[in-house]
């Protein structure tokens, strides 16, 4: 059974939209993955800075406690 012109056009439009949506989802997933990686790296760096600050503060408190 032959398809009418409107059915052919509808199928073509659906395929165009499907392709666009697939590309959009792929790009969004890639961007989200990059954000997760960056957030993780920032969290690690914040933790390292916090640990360094605590270490410095601890050293300063110890130095004050040793004063004669």
Curated annotation (Swiss-Prot):
Q: What does the sequence similarity comment in the record state about its family?
A: Belongs to the HrpA type 2 family.
Protein task: Major structure protein of the hrp pilus, which is a component of the type III secretion system (T3SS, Hrp secretion system) required for effector protein delivery, parasitism, and pathogenicity. The hrp pilus functions as a conduit for protein delivery into the host cell.
UniProt-annotated location(s)? Secreted; Fimbrium
Task: List cellular component terms (GO).
Answer: extracellular region; pilus
Q: What is this protein called?
A: Hrp pili protein HrpA
Q: Does this entry carry the keyword Secreted?
A: yes
Q: Which ranges does the record mark as transmembrane? A: none
Any coiled-coil regions, as ranges:
none
- Alphabetical keyword list: Fimbrium, Secreted, Virulence
